[in-house]
UniProtKB/Swiss-Prot annotation:
Protein's GO biological process: ammonium transmembrane transport; camera-type eye morphogenesis; carbon dioxide transmembrane transport; carbon dioxide transport; cell volume homeostasis; cellular homeostasis; cellular hyperosmotic response; cellular response to cAMP
Species per Swiss-Prot/TrEMBL record: Canis lupus familiaris (Dog)
InterPro entries linked: Aquaporin-like (IPR023271), Aquaporin_1 (IPR023274), Aquaporin_transptr (IPR034294), MIP (IPR000425), MIP_CS (IPR022357)
Phylogenetic lineage: Eukaryota, Metazoa, Chordata, Craniata, Vertebrata
Coiled coil regions, renumbered to chain: none
Modified residues (Phosphotyrosine): 255
Protein name per its UniProtKB record: Aquaporin-1
Reactions it catalyzes: H2O(in) = H2O(out); nitric oxide(out) = nitric oxide(in); CO2(out) = CO2(in); glycerol(in) = glycerol(out)
Residues on Cytoplasmic side: 1-11, 68-70, 85-92, 156-165, 227-271
Amino acid sequence: MASEFKKKLFWRAVVAEFLAMILFVFISIGSALGFNYPVRNNQTAGAAQDNVKVSLAFGLSIATLAQSVGHISGAHLNPAVTLGLLLSCQISILRAVMYIIAQCVGAIVATAILSGITSSLPDNSLGRNELAPGVNSGQGLGIEIIGTLQLVLCVLATTDRRRRDLGGSGPLAIGLSVALGHLLAIDYTGCGINPARSFGSSVITHNFKDHWIFWVGPFIGGALAVLIYDFILAPRSSDLTDRVKVWTSGQVEEYELDGDDINSRVEMKPK
């Protein structure tokens, strides 16, 4: 773990997460706040169109930034994704901690910038997540769990290096998963599925009402996604003890599929 801490590539990855998170939050939440501006009285027809625009903004920004910095940091841009990859034994504990810190600080910085730019907006929530009227904490938690589960499941499947059937754009697939989560959750919770993004808005607005939902829900969803993918859908035959070593060493071994039958159980072995 100490050796990873000393590597320039490690710190470049942390900086990439920080900068990409600033761009992600600024673009995504900025698109949502734009609906409050009476620019030439240009208002959309209804809430449904608003939801589609915001969902696409969040999804496309993730896809764009994943393509931009994915080769540097992996472009997690979400503590729930980072936790999922940690539990999947693909990153070290040190990297996970530093990524989550970078993501949270980046979200705060981006939201602070937005606060200055949109200071004239009345009742400016800065995209703060909150439960919709009639939605209780249990329901909101369930929505956040499901929305994050499908996202982290998509990340695990799309980045699985054992697969030989992958085609198209991985970043786009993940971005569409983010958009899908927003189409589901916006009307219930404002759609968190990203604790750092929720944290930034709560910090700047000094409002932490029901904020725990937007950490606990995504973390449970991310953990469930790992359980489902790594132990049920695509089990790994490599020794769990060896995989857990990644938590301290930060080294991920390359694996290949064992067997040509696409319907057979996925097996892994070091190259």
